[in-house]
Amino acid sequence: MNPENLNIKIARNVEIMDYKDLAELIFPDVKDISYYEEKYPERNLPEGAVVTRFAPSPTGFVHIGGLYQALVARTVAKKTGGVFFLRVEDTDQKREVENGVTGIVNSLKDFDMAPDEGMISDTDEIGNYGPYKQSLRKEIYQAYAKYLIAQGKAYPCFCTQEELDEIRQKQESAKIRPGYYGVWAKCRNLTVEESAEKIKNGEPYIIRFKSPGREDRKIKHKDVIKGNVDFPENDLDIVIIKADGLPTYHFAHAVDDHLMHTTHVIRSDEWLSSVPLHLQLFHELGFKAPKYAHISPIMKNDNGGKRKLSKRKDPEAAVEYYKKEGIPSEAVKEYLLNIANSTFENWRKANPDKSIDEFDFQLNKMSVSGALFDMIKLLDIGKTVISKMTAEEVYNYSLIWAKEYDEELAKMLEDKEYALKVFGIERGNKKPRKDISKWSDVMYNIGYMYDDEFYGKVNEYPYQVISDKEDIAKILDLYISKYYNESDDKQTWFDKIKELAVEMGYAGEVKEFKANPGMYKAHVGDVSTVLRVALTARTNTPDMYEIMQVLGKNRIAKRLEVAKENLK
């Protein structure tokens, strides 16, 4: 870093005596760490309460794997009466995208996973352990970096990029492990006076951690999910404060999770190899380390092989995809819990009406290997979730989605009274309709109930078994002129269709037709299909009686007439 970045006041003639003086030279105006230790006291929580966080970087869209981690973290915290907070890790500001923080906050809101603490908008936050944006915690990190320098556990590094490239080239030529460590750490053994002289001369520098580790030694670590794992010790002198004065991820993680009193760090297993470094940082800073739980990634079947869901290849990798498709947030969360704990599926079967919040989630029972993403199963869960909603709920969710993604559907739903009748078909029964898996299905599944949509798109009537046009026309004529009465109850309605079938030479019972197929043209089910197709242009719909009750006499009469005209 340039001294100007830190507002360093250099007294060129001051004699540097020890590490504390060097620390003061580099960070003269930062507070002592005791100030922050007092400012962020232990949380007043019940015994056993877990404090977790979701700590994404605003460098792109929110990945479904990120939402998965957030759901697990939130579930564990809620179960124990703990705290789930949102921290934005925005120290890599070159990669930050516009509205990145807003996208993160909105994704959690969309899935009803708003944090107890942390960022609640691009600029606003709640909680007593902030700031919750790392870019606003610069002085905090510098205070702890100063502490390490004063202890001889960190040092300024003046190596240029050219020098670092040269080190790497020599390591590659010698076929040895690359990195800034041991004899390759050129600035590690500079004396305090040498470092001070370079600083006074205005040489740019960064701050590195002085690792006490040796690669030939092993550490044993118990991960909450992965179990016992052995690693070589970290011996890399990693950068902890960059040239711009901001911390690296590793250093910020240790400082933040200490001051915010995170008890469990739940994150992707791509960070598993960083555990030795992170534990080392916690130890050298004098912090109690949190427990780590490394989640396996969500996988995809790719031509018989497994690979991670890719931001580049797979649209379903983005959380925004589920919103655009209109997959209910509750369905997505339920599906993710399904792959998180193998016991969830049986629990759901035994408790079909309970909230997912009542499931006894076990972090240590998560799979150590990545689960395959199954869109079919997710949509099936979506059908179940929507089937349990009231007509009013389905209407409201459909309208909210349509206003953003389907202008035609939004216009169609303007008549709320009629829409509620449509959505009420086969809803509230013991076996409610399950034809809608996501809000983008709504137009297809109810469009035929609206005349403009029906007449605008009907181009054929798939009558199936009965193909004789004269018979079809006569069925339609007789039904509207002789048998239809909108005040009939369901049994009377169906009995009349049976009478119509018999009058036309069809079996009034399916079993009669099967017993003597030669005696009948077909059976009552086929006659019902003619009416269904004439009224909806579909062979498969929810309950036909309920559909006709909603359509009403005038619509029915007109549709049967149009269907008859279509036969000519």
Place the predicted regions along the sequence by residue.
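N-terminal Rossmann-like or analogous alpha/beta NTP/dinucleotide-binding catalytic cores
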Residues: 2-173, 273-287, 331
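Active-site cores that bind ATP or allylic diphosphates and position pyrophosphate for catalysis
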Residues: 155-294, 299-309, 318, 476-487, ...
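Glycine- and acidic
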Residues: 52-59, 85-90, 259-265, 316-318, ...
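A generic secondary-structure signal for well-formed alpha-helical elements
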Residues: 108-115, 149-156, 168-171, 175-178, ...
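Residue-level signal for inorganic ion chemistry
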Residues: 73, 104, 148, 152, ...
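Helix-rich, typically C-terminal accessory recognition domains appended to large enzymatic cores
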Residues: 495-504, 508-551, 555
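Catalytic adenosine-cofactor/nucleotide-binding cores of aminoacyl-tRNA synthetases and other
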Residues: 285-466, 536-568
